[in-house]
Amino acid sequence: MQASAKNRSFTQLIEFEIEPRQQSGLVSALSMQTERLAQRYQGLISASVQASDDGRRVLSLLQWQTREAGEAAFRSFESGEQDFWALIRAHQAKTVTFNSFQVLSSIARSHDDALHCNLIS
């Protein structure tokens, strides 16, 4: 049985290119912003903020239950509600790349150490 595209979870990736001295501050700011998103918007499954070893990149990953949930949160960036553009300026990001993906397969380890695979086709 084929799952509807509407039922697939949705992932947003935002990659920042920065100077190494800005990395820890940007990681902290993105972590706080992600916490606010989780409190204000329904449908957040998971989120992470990742930093490159060379200090020049930060990756924000947000996984949502639906595309609509992710897009609602993203609109808050565009409208200035989350002050995303101020965050970019404050940490002097050289480039910011936005990408979005539908999740078609995922593997996760449960609390009992079992692996669970979810394939959506």
What are these regions (language model features)?
Residues 17-30:
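Short, surface-exposed ligand-recognition loops at beta-strand->loop->(often short) alpha-helix junctions
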Residues 9-17, 46-78, 113-121:
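Short, well-ordered beta-strand segments in beta-rich or mixed alpha/beta enzyme
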Residues 1-8, 48-56, 84-121:
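Glycine-rich beta-strand-turn "strand-cap" elements at beta-sheet edges
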Residues 5, 32, 36-45, 63-99:
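An amphipathic, aromatic/His-enriched active-site/gating alpha helix that lines ligand/cofactor pockets
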